[in-house]
Design a protein with these regions (language model features):
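Glycine-centered hinge/linker elements that transmit conformational signals in sensory
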Residues: 8-37, 80
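Extracytoplasmic/periplasmic substrate-recognition and gating elements
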Residues: 28-31, 68-135
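Beta->alpha turn/N-cap motifs
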Residues: 40, 57-62, 80, 96-98
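Short helix-initiation/N-cap motifs at beta->coil->alpha
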Residues: 35-49
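C-terminal capping/gating helix-and-loop segments adjacent to ligand/active sites or protein-protein/ligand interfaces
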Residues: 154-177
């Protein structure tokens, strides 16, 4: 619910939600509840070796978690915790990958917009093909109704993870820039 931007300007001074987030992050590190890896290999190893109890990340991390067969059935996809004392805080956020844009340098913006609208922003069938073949998960909400998105995952103990992810995506609050 909160934003580091207000009216197109960075809003860091006096941003109570940001301050509370940083304080909570520091507390989690100081109390050794959370580990902040700066090395990608160590980060992934923490999930694959079972030393991480959880991870707050985008859905694209799933393939890294699934790289360790012995972790099957030990993971599930859930919404994230929220800061109780921050107005507008939710259990949902976006971690990249859900935006499409047309450059101002585009020679045919109408064609580009139409392409995005009818493919990534308008075709459940496209995502039904992309999900099993490329692992591309949609934030296009109607995709959650498809048969492919409702299939369960043995790795995630029978959870319909893709349906849940699209459902969560529909609850991510907008951010004002």
């Amino acid at each position: 619910g909160a934003s580091p931007m207000v009216d197109g300007k960075v809003d860091l001074v006096g941003n109570e939600a940001l301050k509370k987030s940083i304080e909570t992050y520091k507390q989690l590190i100081d109390e050794k509840i959370m580990v902040d890896y700066t090395d990608w290999d160590q980060y992934i190893a923490s999930m694959n070796k079972g030393t991480a109890a959880g991870v707050i990340q985008g859905c694209w991390i799933m393939s890294s978690i699934q790289a360790a067969d012995d972790q099957a059935g030990k993971w599930s996809i859930v919404n994230m915790p929220k800061l109780d004392d921050v107005g507008g805080a939710t259990n949902y956020a976006n971690c990249g990958g859900a935006s499409w844009a047309v450059s101002s340098n585009c020679k045919n913006t109408d064609l580009a917009y139409d392409f995005l609208k009818t493919t990534f922003g308008g075709s459940v069938e496209l995502y039904d093909d992309l999900l099993p073949n490329a692992g591309a998960i949609a934030s296009y909400l109607p995709a959650a109704e498809s048969k492919v998105y409702n299939e369960t995952s043995d790795f995630y103990a029978g959870q319909a993870v893709y349906k849940d992810i699209v459902d969560f995506a529909g609850k991510v609050p907008g951010i004002d820039y």
